[in-house]
Amino acid sequence: MALTVNVVGPAPWGFRISGGRDFHTPIIVTKVTERGKAEAADLRPGDIIVAINGESAESMLHAEAQSKIRQSASPLRLQLDRSQTASPGQINGEGSLDMLATRFQGSLRTHHNSQSSQRSACFSPASLSPRPDSPFSTPPPTSPIALSGENVIGCSFQSLTHSPGLAATHHLTYPGQPTSQQAGHSSPSDSTVRVLLHSPGRPSSPRLSSLDLEEDSEVFKMLQENRQGRAAPRQSSSFRLLQEALEAEERGGTPAFVPSSLSPKASLPTSRALATPPKLHTCEKCSVNISNQAVRIQEGRYRHPGCYTCADCGLNLKMRGHFWVGNELYCEKHARQRYSMPGTLSSQA
């Protein structure tokens, strides 16, 4: 449907476009701002812009169309091609609630039709027709296709026919009629489809059509948890050796060797080292054990750093060196005062 829209300005006009000759698509309105100038002029998302101010937009690039719209004077005259299915409540590229509900119902209807076609294919008259010599040659009045709420296992007639183990256990059973075992006609060539009749209110579940459990199903997870719960807890080898050593020690025997860092043999040197305290030096000046830093004066002679001072002035000799005068330590100044001859001094730096 062709129509013309006049958007009263000035810019900005309140809508966005996409497409162009460089995108090989027509120029389409993709978004309309709520309560804007474009919405007031009845411009809608999905409208195809045919001409801008009388100039054809078919051969325009995207940037060229944007520039012409932005630089246009008021009013902006747009010739549009609007689809008949465009919803008037569509805003910013999203449909209204009515349109979304219609699409959702259509998808549900399509899904329901596909399921119905699959069920009718599984239970076609050719696949459900019994053999002439089978006990079900006379079909019951109620057809299994007409029953609602049935859960069907084994839709594929061909796959069950090629499986003798499954063919012997899956038979078409009806209420009030004897089975093939009761009639004495148990053979793998009988009908290989079994229909379980339930209450009409329960819908059919397509997941029951598989004989194998899926790994992500709740039933499979529950079975795995039950198996893990019944399994005996595993004991590590190191814990088992430690338990045997403790039991042997309780019985009064020789404890077994545990090959780990916690074994008695491995911890023996550590215990001896902790039992023997380190040897402490004794300060020769104050006769107190030196527990931290010690100053070694001569072999076997140590002092505290605070006791390593001049005997006359108390100056610390750590950075200056000491001079012996008898058995006392002096600095160089007071040592020279006690002896006039330098040769009598005994110095050590």
UniProtKB/Swiss-Prot annotation:
One Pfam family cited in the UniProt record for this chain: PDZ
Transmembrane feature ranges: none
SMART domains, alphabetized: LIM, PDZ
Region (Disordered): 72-95, 108-147, 168-212, 250-272
InterPro entries: PDLI1-4/Zasp-like_mid (IPR031847), PDZ (IPR001478), PDZ-LIM_domain (IPR050604), PDZ_sf (IPR036034), Znf_LIM (IPR001781)
PROSITE patterns the record matches: LIM_DOMAIN_1 (PS00478), LIM_DOMAIN_2 (PS50023), PDZ (PS50106)
Keyword tags: Cytoplasm, Cytoskeleton, LIM domain, Metal-binding, Phosphoprotein, Zinc
Gene Ontology annotations for the cellular component aspect, listed alphabetically: adherens junction; cortical actin cytoskeleton; filamentous actin; stress fiber; Z disc
Domain PDZ, chain residue ranges per copy: 1-84
Compositionally biased region (Polar residues): 81-90, 108-121, 176-192, 260-270
Reported tissue expression: Highly expressed in cornea and lung. Expressed at intermediate level in sclera and combined tissues of the eye irido-corneal angle. Specifically expressed in the corneal epithelial cells but not in other corneal layers.
One example GO MF annotation: filamin binding
Post-translational modification Phosphothreonine, affected residues: 138, 142
Phosphoserine PTM sites in chain numbering: 124, 127, 129, 134, 137, 143, 163, 199, 204-205, 209-210, 263
Domain LIM zinc-binding: 281-341
Protein's UniProt keywords contain Metal-binding: yes
Role, per record: Probable adapter protein located at the actin cytoskeleton that promotes cell attachment. Necessary for the migratory capacity of epithelial cells. Overexpression enhances cell adhesion to collagen and fibronectin and suppresses anchorage independent growth. May contribute to tumor cell migratory capacity.
Listed name of the protein: PDZ and LIM domain protein 2
Lineage: Eukaryota, Metazoa, Chordata, Craniata, Vertebrata
Gene that encodes the chain: Pdlim2
